UniProtKB/Swiss-Prot annotation:
It holds the Pfam family DUF1656. Belongs to the AaeX family. This is Protein AaeX. It comes from the Bacteria. The keyword Transcription regulation does not apply.
Length: 67
């Protein structure tokens, strides 16, 4: 259960997890842009799977901050 209430914008109600998902997506884009020039994707077997796992880990860490 999150500490934040349901947010209503223009008659649409958004659960708190929606904003955590958006924030983790923004952090994911920043981390990904930082990792691409380092060449780490040359060592990754499946880049799409790596990106999905990275996003899931970031979302988990971010959601643990708001509990």
């Amino acid at each position: 259960m999150s500490l934040f209430p349901v947010i209503v914008i223009f008659g649409l109600s958004f659960p708190p997890i929606f904003f955590e998902l958006l924030l983790s997506l923004a952090i994911f884009w920043l981390v990904r842009r930082a990792l691409i020039p380092t060449g780490i994707y040359d060592f990754v077997w499946h880049p799409a799977l790596f990106n999905t796992a990275l996003y899931c880990c970031l979302f988990y860490l971010l959601s643990r901050l708001f509990v």
